[in-house]
């Protein structure tokens, strides 16, 4: 079960990781400033939208629209909102690991201001994502287009950031083996997923659908990563993170939201380890040199390798190079040379004989990779 901790407890904590899988009660900037540097893999932020509602909204039948009119969404001016945005973004960057990324979601009311400030602070935008809603709220007055989407910005802490997580192969496989696009179609949160109080009213006015958070976490985190949400609300980020085997840290100042989020997260059952395996491409696999096969004894010096049709042959030398007809070089260079080509993938071109069957040396590389995976 997730715990709820105060800012005072975080500040005087002797153990630096006691805030994992917890909801910190307090102001987001103060809470962020109490966390260790470079301790978070991903930030998902759903900040106040600063809707600037001029009054109550009514449907054509004069029933009241359940819009966001809470105090936490009220700012005296755009300047005040911008100052608040700069403060929490800077605090998030401090806690992000150098390989970490930040997601922020907003509507047309705030996302352009947030995006401009992000770039002013030298965050580096990787993508903007359109969340297209299958069931958006109508424009009741008929004076504008129906607002049917929200925008997400995905960014690294700076332009030179390297090594961030993007599970490209998993996203492609989930999209019927076609590259995942930057426009995502999800319904707004409704039905049994929508948290409601004893009075039947929504617990939180802007609760995000779990499917949206699941895609974000599956795309940009690994099992065991730490996901921070500085505007935790009803705890969607924490619930999805727990289910997907990620750690979470939530920051929230409203006790009613904290209570609802803690109860919600406590009811979540994490998925099994085997279920959480993420598909990876060859680029994500550990690099194995051909010489490693020789050093490990999988291929012995003096072994004769051929192509699949036995047209070309080469002898394996003790230093991990190949020799053929007075030429010598790497598996790739010699493979290209004997064919008269500019380039060659030696792993799939050269074959070894097992019994009477020719097999690509890439199979032996897989043996080494599997051994490395067991060590990790």
From Swiss-Prot:
Looking up InterPro entries in the UniProt record yields:
DNA_methylase_N4/N6, DNA_methylase_N6_adenine_CS, RAMA, RM_Methyltransferase, SAM-dependent_MTases_sf
**EC no.?**
2.1.1.72
**Which superkingdom is the protein from?**
Bacteria
Q: Where is the signal peptide?
A: none
Q: Which GO terms describe its molecular function?
A: DNA binding; N-methyltransferase activity; site-specific DNA-methyltransferase (adenine-specific) activity
- PROSITE patterns per the UniProt record, alphabetical: N6_MTASE
Q: What does this protein do?
A: Overexpression leads to many branched and bloated cells, two to three times the size of wild-type cells, and cells that have 1-3 times the normal amount of DNA. Contributes to the accurate cell-cycle control of DNA replication and cellular morphology. Can fully replace its ortholog in C.crescentus.
For this chain, the family text in UniProt reads:
Belongs to the N(4)/N(6)-methyltransferase family.
Q: What is this protein called?
A: DNA methyltransferase CcrM
Protein source organism? Rhizobium meliloti (strain 1021)
Q: Which gene encodes it?
A: smeIM
């Amino acid at each position: 079960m997730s715990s709820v901790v105060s800012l005072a407890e975080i500040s005087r904590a002797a153990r630096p990781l006691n805030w994992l899988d917890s909801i910190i009660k307090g102001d987001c900037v103060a809470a962020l400033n109490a966390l260790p540097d470079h301790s978070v893999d991903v930030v998902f932020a759903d900040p106040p939208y600063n809707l600037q509602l001029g009054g109550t909204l009514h449907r054509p039948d004069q029933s009241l629209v359940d819009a966001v009119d809470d105090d936490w969404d009220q700012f005296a001016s755009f300047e005040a909102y911008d100052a608040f945005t700069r403060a929490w973004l800077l605090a998030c960057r401090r806690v992000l690991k150098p390989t970490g990324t930040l997601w922020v979601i907003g509507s047309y009311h705030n996302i352009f201001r947030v995006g401009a400030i992000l770039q002013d602070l030298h965050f580096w935008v990787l993508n903007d994502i359109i969340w297209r809603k299958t069931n958006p709220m109508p424009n009741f007055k008929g004076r504008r287009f129906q607002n049917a989407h929200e925008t997400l910005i995905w960014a690294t802490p700076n332009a030179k950031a390297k090594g961030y997580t993007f599970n490209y192969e998993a996203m492609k496989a989930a999209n019927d083996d076609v590259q995942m696009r930057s426009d995502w179609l999800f319904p707004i949160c409704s039905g049994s997923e929508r948290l409601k109080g004893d009075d039947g009213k929504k617990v939180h006015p802007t609760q995000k659908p779990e499917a949206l958070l699941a895609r974000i976490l599956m795309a940009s985190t690994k099992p065991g990563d730490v996901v921070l949400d500085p505007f935790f609300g009803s705890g969607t980020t924490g619930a999805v993170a727990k289910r997907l085997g990620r750690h979470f840290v939530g920051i929230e100042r409203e006790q009613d939201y904290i209570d609802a989020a803690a109860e919600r997260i406590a009811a979540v059952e994490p998925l099994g380890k085997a279920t959480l395996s993420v598909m990876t491409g060859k680029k994500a696999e550990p690099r194995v040199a051909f010489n490693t096969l020789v050093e490990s004894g999988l291929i012995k010096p003096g072994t004769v390798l051929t192509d699949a049709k036995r047209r070309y042959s080469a002898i394996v030398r003790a230093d991990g190079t190949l020799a053929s007809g007075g030429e010598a070089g790497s598996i790739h260079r010699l493979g290209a040379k004997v064919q008269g080509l500019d380039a060659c993938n030696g792993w799939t071109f050269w074959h070894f004989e097992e019994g009477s069957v020719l097999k690509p040396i890439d199979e032996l590389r897989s043996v080494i990779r599997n051994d490395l995976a067991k060590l990790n």
